[in-house]
């Protein structure tokens, strides 16, 4: 689909929930292993066309308002604004590449291969990076079909000021439904009423912070001069990205033992987050102003769709996350772990930290969310907070059902899901979607090379890890991947 036939829609302003994030792009890849990769191209292209026909704002661009300073809007992309060479869904043929062997992600052993070189920019060839480098008009989302020797890597690359991680998951579910419908012509329930649902939800979220916005008087400004003034994210090519598999049995055991000890109830997601916070606090911490005791700050991304009253629809595509900060002295975190001499000590410590996280989450209700988001009334507000400077940041996609989706007779199911490291800063951890067969907790971690080595040597972390590897989306068609 080109800009000439892009669906039209009524422009709309972004909400306070959207301004809680800076202008950056987040991407994920869906890998399909195919005997005839070319056959998958029209299936995915038609699916994208059907989705954008039902949700035309996905073809739009994010630009500053022409009349309201600090306000960003989504508009239809007029011909020439981004150029005809910038299609909604691009096809790129990479016959010299192939998917990693099936055993690479499922059974990587505990040896990391630290002598191996890693280039985090290498995988970015599968992403339409042009969307992120536009000077003024920032596309809402772009797709790229990468055709390899033995399959397809389908990339979704979205503007995080419009679509969050859950939104990408919903779009993936819509894609699957469109692909499995015979000849891509049958009805798709997921698309029915989607545009009305988006409009109603945005109207509700648009009321948050309205009073604060009305208190400030702005002079009308030209759209081209109203560039967003949020924090500028920088892609750091020197960082490394690793995938770790944590034992599902041990995570379950920690939770059960915590309950036996009378520690406040915590979910397994809380347990994994606590583990990452504990282990990384050993080398990622800070000293508060005028304080001798160092502390470690955790930033946890929380999906608040169901914490609103009434709840926001689960399948709303726009931003509906908040960032919750929690800070503890390192003496309570890594210090406590250093003093733990037995497995029982480990279980108790993790349970205690996880209960702190659960207790904080239990306080997040409708009023809490509205008060939190009310501070983000304009695009530049994010830059004036400190929430983007944590020691450790954790977001969870564990509940995303990508591995159970059926993409039809041509594509079948996804063999691998990855988050692209583009713009991922130091200290970010992503709990990845659960696989259908393997219950292990897969976690993607971004750190400096030195800190990654420190994490791998952490005693508690080594006790939990059952497999690890560098981020590995594809390989040379001539290469045989081993984890040694």
Swiss-Prot record:
Gene3D superfamilies recorded: Chloramphenicol acetyltransferase-like domain (3.30.559.10)
Enzyme Commission number, as recorded: 2.3.1.-
Biotechnological applications listed in the UniProt record: Hancockiamide D displays potent cytotoxic activity against murine myeloma NS-1 cells, suggesting a potential antitumour application. More interestingly, hancockiamide C, the likely end metabolite of the hkm pathway, shows potent Arabidopsis thaliana seed anti-germination activity, but is inactive against the monocot Eragrostis tef seed, suggesting that it could be a herbicidal lead targeting monocots. The herbicidal activity of hancockiamide C could be due to its phenylpropanoid-like structural features, which may act on the plant lignan pathways, and hence warrants further investigations.
Catalysis performed (reactions): hancockiamide A + acetyl-CoA = hancockiamide B + CoA + H(+); hancockiamide G + acetyl-CoA = hancockiamide C + CoA + H(+)
Top-rank taxon: Eukaryota
InterPro entries: CAT-like_dom_sf (IPR023213), Sec_Metabolite_Acyltrans (IPR051283)
Keywords from the named record: Acyltransferase, Transferase
Keyword Thylakoid: no
Pathway: Secondary metabolite biosynthesis
Molecular function via GO: acyltransferase activity
A family per Pfam: Transferase
Family as reported in the entry's similarity comment: Belongs to the fumigaclavine B O-acetyltransferase family.
Physiological role: O-acetyltransferase; part of the gene cluster that mediates the biosynthesis of hancockiamides, an unusual new family of N-cinnamoylated piperazines. The NRPS hkm10 and the NmrA-like reductase hkm9 are proposed to convert two molecules of L-Phe to the intermediary piperazine called xenocockiamide A. Xenocockiamide A is then converted to hancockiamide D via a series of hydroxylations and O-methylations.
Protein name: O-acetyltransferase hkm3
């Amino acid at each position: 689909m080109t800009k000439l036939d892009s669906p039209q829609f009524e422009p709309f302003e972004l909400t306070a929930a959207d301004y809680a994030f800076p202008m950056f792009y987040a991407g994920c890849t869906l890998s399909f292993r195919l005997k005839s990769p070319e056959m998958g191209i029209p299936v995915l292209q038609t699916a994208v066309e059907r989705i954008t026909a039902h949700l035309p704002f996905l073809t739009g661009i994010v630009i500053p308002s022409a009349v309201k300073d600090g306000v960003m809007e989504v508009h239809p992309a007029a011909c020439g604004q981004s150029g005809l060479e910038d299609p909604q869904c691009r096809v790129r043929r990479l016959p010299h590449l192939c998917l990693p062997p099936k055993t690479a992600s499922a059974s990587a052993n505990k040896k990391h291969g630290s002598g191996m070189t890693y280039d985090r920019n290498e995988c970015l060839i599968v992403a339409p990076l042009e969307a992120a480098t536009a000077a003024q008009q920032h596309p809402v989302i772009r797709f790229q079909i990468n055709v390899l020797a033995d399959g397809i890597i389908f990339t979704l690359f979205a503007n995080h000021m419009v679509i969050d991680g859950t939104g990408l998951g919903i779009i993936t579910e819509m894609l699957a439904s469109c692909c499995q419908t015979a000849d891509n012509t049958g009805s798709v329930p997921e698309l029915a009423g989607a545009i009305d649902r988006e409009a109603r939800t945005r109207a509700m979220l648009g009321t948050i912070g309205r009073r604060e916005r009305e208190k400030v008087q702005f002079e009308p400004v030209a759209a081209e001069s109203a560039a967003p003034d949020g924090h500028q994210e920088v892609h750091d090519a020197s960082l490394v990205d690793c995938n770790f598999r944590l034992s599902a049995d041990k995570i379950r055991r920690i939770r059960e033992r915590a309950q036996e000890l009378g520690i406040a109830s915590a979910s397994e997601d809380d347990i994994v987050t606590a583990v990452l916070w504990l282990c990384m606090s050993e080398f990622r911490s800070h000293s508060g102003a005028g304080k001798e005791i160092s502390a470690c700050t955790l930033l946890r991304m929380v999906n608040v769709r169901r914490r609103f009253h009434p709840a926001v629809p689960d399948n709303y595509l726009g931003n509906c996350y908040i960032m919750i900060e929690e800070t503890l002295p390192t003496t309570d975190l890594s210090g406590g772990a250093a003093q733990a001499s037995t497995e029982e000590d480990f279980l108790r410590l993790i349970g205690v930290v996880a209960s702190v996280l659960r207790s904080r989450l239990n306080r997040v209700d409708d009023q809490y969310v509205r008060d939190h988001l009310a501070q983000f009334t304009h695009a530049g507000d994010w830059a004036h907070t400190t929430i983007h400077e944590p020691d450790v940041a954790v977001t969870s996609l564990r509940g995303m059902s990508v591995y159970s989706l059926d993409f039809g007779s041509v594509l079948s199911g996804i063999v691998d899901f990855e988050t692209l490291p583009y713009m991922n800063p130091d200290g970010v951890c992503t709990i990845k979607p659960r696989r259908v067969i393997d219950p292990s907790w897969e976690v993607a971690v971004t750190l400096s090379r030195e800190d990654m080595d420190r994490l791998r040597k952490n005693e508690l972390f080594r006790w939990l890890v059952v497999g690890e590897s560098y981020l590995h989306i594809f390989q040379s068609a001539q290469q045989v991947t081993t984890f040694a």
